[in-house]
């Protein structure tokens, strides 16, 4: 797939906050999301040389069937899927590549979660 991606392309890979923080409820889920974040951070510099951006999007809780309604706390806020889709579209225009972007609420802007040693601004 990557050899066929043209210069100017933008790739957004969906991870999760579980990919950048401990998630003791489901360690295997966390492991898979950490792998996504690592892949994006590793591919960023290489793809940048080809004019391609890649981002990991790490949202918090989203209103999907992964957590059944009867298991949800009434005090926990879930973001709407359509809001997340809008955020992903916005990432297509970000030029800083190989970064992990977090979104914890619909009311707050997304932000970069820097890797250790990342000195970019």
Describe each PLM feature range.
Residues 12, 54-57, 67:
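Hydrophobic structural elements of the Rossmann-like NAD(P)H-binding subdomain
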Residues 16:
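Residue(s) in the substrate-gating loop at a strand-loop-helix junction
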Residues 32:
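Active-site helix of classical SDR
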Residues 2, 40-41, 85-88:
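Short-chain dehydrogenase/reductase
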Residues 56, 64, 72-117:
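C-terminal helical subdomain
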Residues 35-43, 47, 57:
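Hydrophobic alpha-helix immediately C-terminal to the catalytic Tyr-X-X-X-Lys motif of short-chain
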Residues 4, 21, 42-52:
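Active-site-adjacent segment of SDR/Rossmann-fold oxidoreductases
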Residues 22-26:
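Active-site "substrate specificity/gating" loop of NAD(P)-dependent dehydrogenases
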């Amino acid at each position: 797939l990557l050899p066929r991606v043209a210069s100017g392309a933008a790739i957004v890979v969906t991870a999760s906050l579980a990919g950048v923080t401990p998630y003791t409820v489901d360690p295997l889920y966390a492991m898979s999301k950490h792998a996504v974040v690592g892949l994006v951070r590793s591919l960023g510099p290489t793809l940048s040389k080809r004019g391609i951006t890649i981002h990991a999007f790490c949202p918090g809780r989203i209103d999907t069937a992964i957590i059944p309604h009867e298991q949800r706390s009434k005090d926990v806020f879930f973001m709407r899927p359509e809001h997340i889709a809008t955020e992903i579209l916005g990432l297509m225009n970000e030029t800083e590549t190989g970064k992990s972007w977090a979104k914890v609420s619909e009311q707050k802007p997304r932000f970069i979660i820097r890797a250790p040693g990342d000195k970019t601004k």
